[in-house]
Amino acid sequence: MDYELVVGLEVHCQLNTVTKAFCGCSAQFGKAANTNVCPVCLALPGALPVLNRQVVEDAVKIGLALDCRIAPHSVLARKNYFYPDLPKGYQISQFEEPICSDGSIDVELDGVNRTIHLIRIHIEEDAGKSIHDIGDDTFIDLNRSGVPLLEIVSYPDIRSAKEASAYLQKLRQIVKYLGISDGNMEEGSLRCDANVSLRPVGATEYGTRTEIKNMNSFKNVEKAIEYEALRHREILENGGVIIQETRLWDADKGETRSMRGKEFAHDYRYFPDPDLVPVLVDEAMIERLKLELPEFPEMRARRFAADYGIPTYDAGVLTVERELADYFEETVKLSGDAKTSSNWVMGEVMRTLKEKYLDIAEFSIRPARLAGLIQLIHNKVISNTIAKQVFEVMLNDEAEPAAIVERDGLAQVSDSGALEAVAQEVIDANPKQLAEYREGKTKLMGFFVGQCMSRMKGKANPQLVNDILLKKLEG
C-alpha cells in the first residue's frame, strides 16, 4: 500500500525582548546560572506577574506578517503540569483565545510553491533548564524561566521532510526580518516539534501521530521526520499499530526513542490565569505596528532586480538575510555601482563571512569602506586583481582603501610608454607563441596578457595592456 506523509509543526520562537515575559528580569542568553531571576521567576508566594507589552506587540507583528486574524481580546491561561524546571507547577500560555489565528506561510521547494496554513500563534513563557552534565547530580537553572515565546502552530499541510525544513527556514527568515528573534536553533531561540503520521494515499482521515522533539537544526528536522516516517511505514506494513506518543530525536544514533505518552489538551487542565488581565489589542495598535513592518524578502528581491538591474538569482541571494540586504543597499548608495557592489558582496564578502563564521553585523569592512574600494576600481585607480589584495588588507587594517593603495604602492599603471616596453619584452621573450598566434591561435592573447600582468605585479591597466598587445601582435 502507498502511504502519504502528513506533518504539522509546532514552532517555539524565543523573542529577543530586553526583559522576560512577566517580570523585569533580563532575558539575555548565556548568563551564569540563576542570576537572571526574581521572586516571579522563582514562583515565590505572593509574587505577581505583569505582562511585557513588547511581547504583545511582537505577537501582533508576526500575526500581521503571516496574514493572521488578530484577536482584539485574548486570554492568558495556566497550563498545569509538573516538571522540575517549572517552579510554579504551571506554565503561563494561551489556550481557547490565542492572540493570532489562521494565517499562512508560502514556501518554494524545487520550483513549486506551496501554502502551509496556520492554526494559531499564541504567547507563552519558557520553562527553566535541567542540567545533567555536572557529576551525578541534576541541577536547575531558572534563567530561562519566564523568557517570552511565541508558539506558531501549523495545520498538518506539510507532505515531506524537505518541505518541513523549507517551512521552518522561511519562518526563521520572517522572524529575523521582523527583528523579534535571532532564530538561532542551536541556542534554542527557535525550537521545533513535529507531529508525524502516515495515511493511505487518497484517504481523508489522518493516521495516528507521534510528536518528535529535540531537533536543533534544519538538517535534523529532515532526518528525524524521514526516520519517523520509515518507522511508521514498517509498523503498518507488518500489521502493527502506531502508538500516539512523544519521541525524542537522537542525532548521534540517527533515530527516535520513546519519551512519554502523548498528552491531550485536557491533561493540562487549562484555565484563565486569575493573576493576569485579558490582552487587549485595538485598531490603533494594529495600524501603528503595520507601519513598522519591514519590506519582506520576496518584495525586496523584486525591487532589487528592477531598480538595480541585477539578475533575479542575485537579488534572491542578497535578500535572504535582512542585514545582508541592508549592507548591499548601503554599498550601492555610496558607490553608485549596483552591479559591481552585487559582485563584491556575493563574492568576496560572503566568502569571507563563510570562512570566518561571521554574521554581516560582525564584518569589519562596513559599506562605506567597500564602496570606497569599488570607486577605486570604477575610476581605474586599481584593477580587480589588485582590489582583491586591498580587500584582504582591509580585513585587518582600518585604513581607508585609497590610503592602503597609496601606502603600499598598488595604484594601477596606465602609462602607455611603460606598458608598451613591457609588452615588447614579453613578445621578444616568446617567439614560439608569437609565431603560433600569427598562425591563427588567437587564444594565446590570454598568455601574453598574463605575462605582462605578471611582470607588472598585477598593477598594469589590463584593458590598455590588451590594446597594446593586440596592436603589436597583429602588426
UniProtKB/Swiss-Prot annotation:
Transmembrane segments: none
Pfam family for this entry, one: GatB_N
Keywords: ATP-binding, Ligase, Nucleotide-binding, Protein biosynthesis
Gene Ontology molecular function: any one: asparaginyl-tRNA synthase (glutamine-hydrolyzing) activity
Enzymatic reactions: L-glutamyl-tRNA(Gln) + L-glutamine + ATP + H2O = L-glutaminyl-tRNA(Gln) + L-glutamate + ADP + phosphate + H(+); L-aspartyl-tRNA(Asn) + L-glutamine + ATP + H2O = L-asparaginyl-tRNA(Asn) + L-glutamate + ADP + phosphate + 2 H(+)
EC number(s) recorded for this UniProt protein: 6.3.5.-
GO BP annotations, alphabetical order: glutaminyl-tRNAGln biosynthesis via transamidation; translation
HAMAP family the record matches: GatB
Subunit structure: Heterotrimer of A, B and C subunits.
Role noted for this protein: Allows the formation of correctly charged Asn-tRNA(Asn) or Gln-tRNA(Gln) through the transamidation of misacylated Asp-tRNA(Asn) or Glu-tRNA(Gln) in organisms which lack either or both of asparaginyl-tRNA or glutaminyl-tRNA synthetases. The reaction takes place in the presence of glutamine and ATP through an activated phospho-Asp-tRNA(Asn) or phospho-Glu-tRNA(Gln).
Protein name: Aspartyl/glutamyl-tRNA(Asn/Gln) amidotransferase subunit B
